[in-house]
C-alpha cells in the first residue's frame, strides 16, 4: 500500500471509530458487564478493520463487520474464562458449576442484564443500546430474525418479572 492510500485508510477507519466506538462499547459493556473488556474488544475490532480495510471497505456494512469481530472477541474471552474456571474447580476437587456465584436482584440495569442468558443479553444490548434493527442483530449474532425476536421477548419478560417481584435473576448458561 502506498503512503497516500495508507493515509486514506487511516482517515476512513478513524472516522468510523469516532462515529461508532462509543455506541459499540456501551452495547458490549451491557453484554459482558465489563467496560474494560468491551472497550478492548471494540478497539481490537477497529485495529483488525484497519489491517483488513482493502477487503472490508467493499462490504455493505463495515461497521457490522467491526461489531461482529468485537462480539466474537467477547465470546472467545468468555469461552476461555469458562474453561479456566472449570479447570480450577477440577484442580480444587469441586464438581464444575457447584461454586458458581448466584447474583441477586439489583436496581442496576447492567447487573441485571449480566445475569440474563448470554444470547438474550447480547441481543438486548445490540437492539436497545446500539439501536440495531432485528435484522441487524440477527446478522451480528448469525441467527435468524425469529431467534432475535425470541431472545428479546424472553429477555423483556424475564426483566419484567424481576422488576415486578424483586426476585433474583439467575442465568441459564
Model-found features: residue ranges?
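A short, charge-rich alpha-helical start-of-domain segment used by transcription regulators
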Residues: 2-26, 36-39
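A short pre-motif secondary-structure segment
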Residues: 123-127
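Structural recognition of an alpha-helix C-terminal capping motif at a helix-to-coil junction
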Residues: 40-47, 60-72
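Arg/Lys-rich amphipathic alpha helix in sigma70-family domain 2
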Residues: 51, 57-58, 68-89, 101-105, ...
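DNA-recognition helix of helix-turn-helix
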Residues: 71, 75, 141-165
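C-terminal flanking helix
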Residues: 21, 25, 46, 117, ...
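Residues within helix-turn-helix
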Residues: 36, 135, 146
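Internal acidic/polar
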Residues: 84-113, 133
Amino acid at each position: 500500500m502506498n503512503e497516500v492510500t495508507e493515509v486514506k485508510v487511516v482517515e476512513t477507519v478513524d472516522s468510523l471509530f469516532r462515529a461508532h466506538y462509543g455506541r459499540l462499547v456501551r452495547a458490549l459493556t451491557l453484554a459482558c458487564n465489563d467496560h474494560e473488556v468491551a472497550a478492548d474488544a471494540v478497539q481490537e475490532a477497529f485495529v483488525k478493520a484497519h489491517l483488513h480495510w482493502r477487503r472490508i471497505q467493499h462490504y455493505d456494512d463495515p461497521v457490522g463487520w467491526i461489531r461482529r469481530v468485537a462480539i466474537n472477541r467477547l465470546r472467545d474471552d468468555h469461552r476461555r474464562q469458562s474453561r479456566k474456571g472449570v479447570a480450577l474447580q477440577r484442580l480444587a476437587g469441586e464438581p464444575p458449576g457447584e461454586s458458581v456465584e448466584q447474583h441477586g436482584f439489583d436496581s442496576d440495569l447492567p447487573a441485571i442484564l449480566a445475569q440474563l442468558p448470554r444470547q438474550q443479553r447480547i441481543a438486548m444490548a445490540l437492539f436497545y443500546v446500539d439501536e440495531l434493527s432485528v435484522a441487524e442483530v440477527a446478522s451480528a449474532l448469525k441467527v435468524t430474525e425469529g431467534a432475535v425476536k425470541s431472545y428479546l421477548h424472553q429477555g423483556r419478560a424475564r426483566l419484567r418479572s424481576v422488576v415486578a417481584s424483586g426476585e433474583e435473576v439467575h442465568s441459564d448458561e
